[in-house]
Amino acid sequence: MSSLTPPNSNQMSALNNHFFFGLTTPKLEEFAPALEATLAYAVTDERVYERTAPEPPDRSWTTPTAAENPLSAWYVTTSISYTDGGPLAGRTVAIKDNVTVAGVPMMNGSRVVEGFTPRYDATVLRRLLDAGATKAGKAVCEDLCFSGSSVTSHPQPVRNPWDESHGYKAGGSSSGSEALVASGHVDCAVGGDGGGSIRIPLACCGIVGCKPTHGLKPYTFPIERTIDHLGPMTRTVGDAAMMLTVLAGTDGLDPRQADHRIEPVDYLAALAEPAGLRVVVVTEGFDTPVQDAAVDDAVRAAILVLRSGCLTVEIVSIPIHLDAFAVWNVIATEGAAYQMLDGNYYGMNTGGFYDPELIIHFSRRRLEHGHQLSKTVKLVGMGGRYTSETGGGKYAAAARQLVREVRAAYDLALARYDVLVMPTLPYTATKIPITDIPLADYLDTALSMIINTAPFDVTGHPALCPVAGAVHGLPVGMMIIGKAHDDDATVLRVAAFEHAVGNYPVPPEAASTLATL
């Protein structure tokens, strides 16, 4: 147990200067006894926590060899199960390594988190195990989950199973989760999405899954609470619906769920309902400045499949979609700098679960290993801190106000149609850089693909992504966006598309494995 030493005179002076209190030295000295008494309460709280914190379970885990981990997608492997029965009985699941598993080390793709072993299981893990799933391991993710590419994870990139030379990116930040499902190493996985981190690798690796409505599922290990989402990654819409059924619902620990009344829904049963007929193609989701025209063509061809299935398909313009990324960018940058970096992951001023040991571990390791953070995280830290200091919070406040306008524009279209449709990404998976590249190119490869995905993190709409086709021998994703808290209906529309196209293609090296499942 640590002790909290009262500040000395130099530290008192620094605190005074930080807040511009203008206290003279004699006045500062008057505050010293009162401050010491205040600090005593913090020490008392620490003693109580240490007395009540549970001991982590004794769970075995293994660091796989290179031969066992050809895609560099596993952080550690395990075999944890609770029951032989349940809707996920017999299914193996990979957990993104930003989700806590008691007694199993986690890294979150970063040297700053490396060495931490949590005492607690995340709610989503407990629900999966209670449903009969077997946890097969922790999947590698990007450094603090802040990259849409798969090149920032420590110690090496996650590789795309569609390329037999393993020279292409898997997408991020849930890079390992997607690669493991696509390659047949596991049946399903859990990922996180704050700017597209589930949907980007879905499109790159050619599987299906979703970012549900914000707050539908309890989150863990936050970046910025208002954009954090967890979601399922699977090979079929049916499996995604089954996972969503298991994982959805409040747990009393996640403040993201405080404003939502979440009733239990059987998303798998919803697939038996008649599909809606109104689909709208969002013009601004196509022909972006970085768009590959062949990707647009593949998505348009997939939309024709929807039309041939007797669905009404129309085209609409939502101009504010072009500005929505900028709104997300301010919130994600300032919010992550405040909560994830300065706030040592959790920040303050909200209810819910906190892990004091993780906070102090992150705080100490950030000071020791901050130089090893990815360039994307460094950009977020510097940019977010600068705009917050120079603007006094006005930029984040303005972005928060604009969220309402962006959400209202999507809701207006969704009031007349069942779902919105656009490409998930502007291009297919790209090659992993083989040498150090200029900063501008590095940031472009890590973040340029999220122009369509990020807006729906900030508005909270559910977004599901089936495979639309292939370009250059690599998968293309199509994003189908539904009404908030109407995830079951959105899943249904994606299932209608999946039924029309049949089975999705699989990576060459996974074909034999998946054929036996």
Curated annotation (Swiss-Prot):
InterPro entries: Amidase, Amidase_CS, Amidase_dom, AS_sf. Keywords: Hydrolase. Its EC number is 3.5.1.4. PROSITE patterns: AMIDASES. It catalyses: a monocarboxylic acid amide + H2O = a monocarboxylate + NH4(+). Disulfide bonds: none annotated. The active site is at residues 96, 173, 197. It is an enzyme of class 3 (hydrolase). Pfam families: Amidase (PF01425). Induction: By aromatic and aliphatic amides. GO terms for molecular function: amidase activity. PANTHER family: AMIDASE, TRANSAMIDASE. Homooctamer. NCBIfam families: PRK07235.1. Belongs to the amidase family. This is Enantioselective amidase. It comes from Rhodococcus rhodochrous. The gene is amdA.
